Amino acid sequence: MRAPAMAAASDVAAALASISARLAAASARAGRAAPPRLVAVSKTKPLPALAAAYAAGQRVFGENYVQELLDKAPQMPADVSWHFIGHLQTNKAKALVAGVPNLACVETVDSAKLADKLQQAAVAAGRAEALGVLVQVNTSGEESKHGVAPSDAPALATHIAASCPALTVRGLMTIGMPDYTSRPENFLCLASVRDAVASALAVPPSTLELSMGMSGDFEAAAEMGSTSVRVGSSIFGAREYPAAA
């Protein structure tokens, strides 16, 4: 059985510095005052890899699997800001919110039912602050992708704002194409949806985040208005999977 390779701490630090520089350059090309937030996607990565990123100054991490996040969160410093970026089943919402006090955002809210479950979970957990959520939008139209249709995003955001006081709508999220890159029209679509959601919520569009861009396209996303990019393999190396039994 081949043991998975893990990037050395120095490699992780160098990768983070390179990505930050590329984000800054892309943002400057677009005339933006500041680059988007970098969410280090640490799914399937061992704790030493996360610790190396933390030591290099990274504080925002994204996880895709509830149990993996529940296992990792208590072993990382309390000032880590965790984003859940995978598909979340409604029956796991309570465990996620209760088990990760420093959960900052669930980026994959794609139904009123899930929002309601997160609302109940946040109240039960006695969170001091509202839990941030993003409405996940399927901008590519692929049936394999989760997320609401662009036209349905305003209604879901309105439901959360009106019926889920323990949650706060921070913006929108979309997932890249099958090759982990997004076409420009996906980014343009999400920006357009933000305008519609902002109108429905009666807030300025600039107050709503756009979580878009991954390892293959984060520079393009930054140039097109992303406020948060989710980068994993470019920081930690190729994704690691448990060996088959």
Regions found by a protein language model. Give the residues of each.
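Conserved alpha/beta-domain cores
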Residues: R2-F218, A222-M224, F236-A238
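Gly/Pro- and small hydrophobic-enriched strand-loop and loop-to-helix capping segments
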Residues: S226-A244
